[in-house]
Amino acid sequence: MRRSLAPSQRGPLRPESRHSFTPPLLKKNKRSCQQELEREQELDRKRQSALRDASNTLELPLPIRFTANSEYERAIAKVLARKFKVPMDNYVPDYGGKRVLGVRRCISRRPLHDPVACNALVLFHPPAYTEHERMGMDPSKVLVHVVVDPLLSNILRPHQREGVRFMYECVEGKRGNFNGCIMADEMGLGKTLQCVTLVWTLLRQGPECKPTINKAIVVSPSSLVKNWEKEFTKWLQGRLLCLPMEGGTKENTIRALEQFSMTSSRLGTPVLLISYETFRIYAEILCKYEVGMVICDEGHRLKNSDNLTYQALMGLKTKRRVLLSGTPIQNDLTEYYSLVNFVNPEMLGTAAVFKRNFESAILRGQNTDSTDAERQRAIAKTQELIGLVDQCIIRRTNQILTKYLPVKFEMVICAKLTSIQLELYTNFLKSDQVRRSLADCKEKASLTALADITTLKKICSHPNLIYEKITARDKGFENSQNVLPSNYNAKDLNPELSGKFMLLDFMLAAIRADGNDKVVLISNYTQTLDLFEQLARKRKYGFVRLDGTMSIKKRSKVVDRFNDPESDSFLFMLSSKAGGCGLNLIGANRLFMFDPDWNPANDEQAMARVWRDGQKKPCYIYRLVASGSIEEKILQRQTHKKSLSSTIIDNNESAEKHFTRDDLKDLFTFDADILSDTHDKLKCKRCVQNIQMKPPPEDTDCTSHLSQWYHCSNNRGLPDNILAQAWMDCKCVSFVFHHRSQAQEIVASAEEAASEQPEEKPDRRKRPSTPLSDDSADEDFLGF
């Protein structure tokens, strides 16, 4: 660009022209301009002819002379005509699109992230087109790769990458003609992170080079709404804003939900986090408009298709449905059908068709009096059902975690009943109350029988739990007042009156004295938590307690305070029914499961609170049962695995209702001299007179069947010195089963683990299985 000169840069003007400037266009007319142009053209022709001579050489002032047609000129021309080539061997253009210079926008489609980058997780691969096919295609309709954001793909572990890919294929209809799936991974495998990855990917990209969905809804228990918000913020680092529905007035809630539902695109908060209860109340608003996808956390809440929450969620206008549950099957096939039908309606037909085709045949084959033909038909129908649901269910066990977490030791401790407990227990079994309960039962347990079972469980824990029944001379305790000591005081806990409490008291004292380990105490009854509190105050232990009475907001603060290493809280008292799911208690590395639940899923959920991501110490899990009592019967029910298929699990919160009269007779039996009723029924071939002569197979661990664990009738060989010392001191332990997890292989962080082993093929099991899934053990487990 020409720049005008400043006055100081110009030379002196002539006097006569100082004030007589005339524009050039006015000095020359049109004719003179034409003449000047012709003159210039003539000079150019003469200049060119003067440069040529007879030898066709160019005269240059340089000393070099060469011909225009020389080999050198041709070589230079060939080099200049060569197309540009990327100086990398075997390089393939990343997106295959054309590039244009300047400000004009390229119309060819490109994926959001590089599919050939290191550690890239590609969920969709477009068809491979030849160059000839590309020439005839509309560039605006070419499909592109769907690539997970590197922010997430670089931290996903191998099994999590597989889970994200599986869910994407399901919701996009790549696995049949359905768009739903069930993520049935066990606790601690990162189901939340996998769902965050799926939602973020669908909100930002798709094969059509545009977002697949505009908004999503995450439905969870009210205690986990805040946790979901934290997870989105943690993994996406604030890149996505969520709309959590917790608290607030009714007017504000309605306004927020209407704005979320009515906005179709460019929504500031495209993810709604809402509890099951709130969704049911405001379902009319949320079901008016379409939504891209719905995720249901703790999805086993939808096992009853007749409840209002299930029906409200079924009315949601979306085809993409993801259900999260570590325990997708908790009772029978009807509940299992409800879950599958929620994510993929009509996959299994109507309820009547499903019952006729599958349920009736399978249940007939499970009866003890079924014929061989009925059992074979049941097996065939079970395999047919598995083949159908395999395409929409993925399940991995926490066996995968063993390579990332410190070692875990699990121990099932059989504690003897004290003399007072023993007398109360046997007197109640011999009472007219139990005799009438058994007489009233014909095919199923009566309500009185179920109440008697609860009474026996309380006797096993501590006499304080039935003190009111004793003083009131309740049925079964008419003559039990003399059993208690004369100075008995229910308000002042005496651990010596209970074998389990005596053992717990000894072990807590040893743990407190030997180091800085923290402990989680879990029970199914809040009354037992009250006894824990009395013990903690008696021994002056710092503690926190979480049960159903605690508000949702306060729970998070309590957990954070306990996990703080500087906190003086030694004990965390937890009700398994109130807070067994979603809690991360890695501040502790020792956990006592004080009483067993009929549903093994509840116990597994609760016991997984300490052995999870972030844990740095070896973990010790203690499961306490009273020797020979109903608690051992419950343990046996938990470990029982039906012979037909691991798809059908015999575990339910109200499993007692399915007991036959013969089952109840077995529950109301007791042998005071037995070391372990469970070990006797195993008919263990590795033990002689309750002494282990042969160790378990090398390839077993704490996920194996109890018959494949270590069996100890004394304190030698125990993995925990504290338990070994308590066995000697309190002399209330009769038998111990113990095993450990596989040794930790990867000490690196999750990010490093994911990047170091991208090629690993994790253990993948699509169909749900029992917690103890060693098929070879069933042959020895004859008594169950």
Curated annotation (Swiss-Prot):
ATP binds at residues 185-192. It is found in: Nucleus. GO terms for biological process: cell division; chromatin remodeling; DNA synthesis involved in double-strand break repair via homologous recombination; double-strand break repair via homologous recombination; double-strand break repair via synthesis-dependent strand annealing; meiotic DNA repair synthesis; oocyte fate determination; oogenesis. The modification Phosphoserine is found at residue 20. Keywords: ATP-binding, Cell cycle, Cell division, DNA damage, DNA repair, DNA-binding, Helicase, Hydrolase, Meiosis, Mitosis, Nucleotide-binding, Nucleus, Phosphoprotein. Residues 36-47 have a biased composition (Basic and acidic residues). Pfam families: Helicase_C, SNF2-rel_dom. GO terms for cellular component: nucleus. One of its GO terms (molecular function) is ATP hydrolysis activity. Residues 1-50, 747-784 are annotated as: Disordered. Residues 2-9 are annotated as: Required for chromatin remodeling, strand pairing activities and coupling of ATPase activity. Residues 747-756 have a biased composition (Low complexity). Its main location: nucleus. It is an enzyme of class 3 (hydrolase). Its EC number is 3.6.4.-. The modification Phosphothreonine is found at residue 22. A motif (DEGH box) lies at residues 297-300. Residues 503-660 form the Helicase C-terminal domain. Residues 172-346 form the Helicase ATP-binding domain. Residues 775-784 have a biased composition (Acidic residues). Belongs to the SNF2/RAD54 helicase family. Interacts (via N-terminus) with spn-A/Rad51. Involved in mitotic DNA repair and meiotic recombination. Functions in the recombinational DNA repair pathway. Essential for interhomolog gene conversion (GC), but may have a less important role in intersister GC than spn-A/Rad51. In the presence of DNA, spn-A/Rad51 enhances the ATPase activity of okr/Rad54. This is DNA repair and recombination protein RAD54-like.
